[in-house]
Amino acid sequence: MTSEPTTFLFSGYARLPQDVSHQAMYKRVGVVLEVDEAGVVVACSTTLMMASADGFFQRLLVGRNVLAERRAIEALVRYRYRGHSQGALVSALHKIFEAVDQSPLATGEPAGPAPGATAPNGGAGGAETHG
């Protein structure tokens, strides 16, 4: 039996500056955050080519709250992440924050089972909405 995740996955992308080594190949940087129901980042990854840069960015974000600490997250990235991709990473984070604002985390909808999911007792997991 597979358990349903209790987290949300958000992604954001932004253009890389011209002076980044892998800009010619990829043009954009991607950021993906896995966030729990309280808004806390539990996992993070980027499309940055260097493992040390990706790992550093992960350490900056894991444990931070995307609902309550947005300004602090951005300030931390701007202060600590001194690589050429800094601006693109911040832009990608802004796109993630916009996606969070449209999710059950920010809209106040219950974050229970996904619409149409089967509840453990075999019943419907929630009302399905279309629109």
Task: Identify the role of each PLM range.
Residues 1-13, 127-131:
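Short, compositionally biased leader-like segments
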Residues 13-19:
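Short polar catalytic/cofactor-binding loops
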Residues 19-131:
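Active-site- and interface-proximal helix/loop "cap" or "latch" segments in soluble metabolic
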